[in-house]
Amino acid sequence: MPAPLTLSARAQALQPSLTLAIAAKAKQLRSEGRDICSLSAGEPDFDTPPFIRTAAAAALESGHTRYGPAAGEPELRQAIATKLTLENGVPTSSDQVLVTNGGKQALYNLFQVLLGPGDEVLLPSPYWLSYPELAQLAGATVKLLPSDASAGFRLQAEQLDAAITPASKLLILNSPSNPTGMVLGRADLEAIAVVLRRHPHVAVVCDEIYEFLLAPGHSHHSFAAVAPDLADRIFIVNGFAKGWAMTGWRIGWLAGPRAVVAAASALQSQSTSNVCTFAQYGALAAVKGPRDCVIAMAEQFNQRRTLLSEGLQTIAGVTLLAPQGAFYAFPDVSAYGLDSMALCRRLLEEVGLAVVPGVAFGDDRCIRLSCAASPATIVDGLERLERCLASL
């Protein structure tokens, strides 16, 4: 009898995505006839704008069906570089851009070429759940820098300064934030820059995937534009999923110092190779095209974010710092005495509401609800949440 195959240590340590698991469970229950209301989605519920779909279809029909450069189509890399230069205030050339299979692969590639055993990643908490897993897959250790609503879910400069050690290699910044909706202002970034100037061995990766999704009165600032003197150790990860409603297209990008981006491109050439060729022409149309569709979707999210936030603030025992961007709310529900996983299980089983436990994001006091749903679905979800909490 053959010996059983043994998984590698890194595979055994890997945790599957809880958000995807919850979404799959909700779909399964719905297919079984259960009345399920899901506020767990991390993707826009809009269709990709027609002009983007048309451009991809035209590229397909015109023969863009072969292998392309591993780093991405040259026109798309140049268009992304131009966008970063003109819109974000970060001077970028096309050889500093790598087109990836979504923002997640951009992070994976970067971590694999930059991190290794003995390296430390500084991660503000709450955090997007894939950050620690991706860092650990690269052999690095993760040091959490916790925050909460009383601090606005913001990384404090003095907290960062105290956390940095000789082993610290990379700081992760995510603004607007998943899951909290926090937006780092210019003053926040300037204070972080002051600290990093004292620690030249620490690089920064800025996840800007929600840059277009901002509540009124808030602005997005690219860290490399605020602190251009640090640009030689700042990486930007972004993509088309959230702003252009292109989650299934799987097109993101990594931008930053040439040598590291080149290494990430070499890694990609030995793994997935190029992103789907004709899909890149849809992305090219998106980044070069008018922003009307992006603005219209962002406005819809503003209305839904307000609806969700105001509804949560009326429920007894629920504490919420109103989100400033992205399309999530992250209320504290610890007054009910249940850990977040237990509460989310009861919500799904008893009232058919699918949301994500805060423990997945590093804060067991909270749950994450998405406003990437119709207003009617948001109202339905709020009613189910209030009904379940009232029964506890």
Language-model regions, residue ranges each:
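PLP-dependent class I/II
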Residues: 1-7, 11-17, 22, 29-36, ...
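A glycine-/small-polar-enriched, mobile loop at the entrance of the PLP active site in fold-type I
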Residues: 40-43, 58-77
